[in-house]
């Protein structure tokens, strides 16, 4: 099978790290294609960044339809554009935050998230609430480091994750830790050994969910909510999004 992993930001070095994590998790017969959109922010650390990343994500989903892709993974812990992406393809589309919290719910009664800057705490609280996990997620723990800081200074990054992970276990009574950024994938295994609880990387979780859905032969329902968008004109910078719209399959 062919899985397209979309890093919604435009930092190619981060995409390479995501690609490595995805390929490490995937089966030997699964082809991983990791990409960044041609347009979007260098990192996603605010609502503004998130919303401006979505057109690039949708563009990559549409390209995937022509590339023979069997499933898509949106590799950002905000799951930007997830629902819109499901409208423009019948292939499975999974987000790494969604995959992480559902996997964690099968491994632990309660768990905490460790992520980047404090400003995104409310964003992620709202996100896990939308997945029905507000009673399972004990805390969204943040660090002073931005998304790209983990790429620039991995030693400082893992130390921050180690500190907040320990606090999550000792103070929150978390029984699992979720790494709340796609750029944290390389730290999961060592943190799990140190903390003594499951540590879940969303890229790995997303790839395994995508493989499973394809294996089961399931596709996105097109009955109502995720049916193809109605054809209409889009103008200005969005002009191309109105061309060749699919309404049936």
Swiss-Prot record:
Temperature impact on function: Optimum temperature is 45 degrees Celsius.
Organism per entry: Pseudomonas sp. (strain NS671)
Record EC number: 5.1.99.5
UniProt pH dependence: Optimum pH is 9.5.
Protein's name according to its UniProt entry: Hydantoin racemase
Regulation: Strongly inhibited by Cu(2+) and Zn(2+). Slightly stimulated by the addition of Mn(2+) or Co(2+), but also by metal-chelating agents such as EDTA or EGTA, indicating that the enzyme is not a metalloenzyme.
Taxonomic path: Bacteria, Pseudomonadati, Pseudomonadota
Gene Ontology biological-process entries: amino acid biosynthetic process
Encoding gene (name): hyuE
Alphabetically ordered keywords of this record: Amino-acid biosynthesis, Isomerase, Plasmid
EC class name: isomerase
Role according to the record: Involved in the asymmetric conversion of racemic 5-substituted hydantoins to the corresponding L-amino acids. Catalyzes the racemization via enolization of D- and L-5-monosubstituted hydantoins. Is able to racemize 5-substituted hydantoins having aromatic or aliphatic substituents such as 5-(2-methylthioethyl)hydantoin, 5-isopropylhydantoin, 5-isobutylhydantoin and 5-benzylhydantoin.
Site (Seems to be responsible for L-isomers recognition and racemization): 181
Subunit composition and interactions: Homohexamer.
Domain of life of the source: Bacteria
MF annotations from Gene Ontology: amino-acid racemase activity; hydantoin racemase activity
A Pfam family that the UniProt record links to this protein: Asp_Glu_race
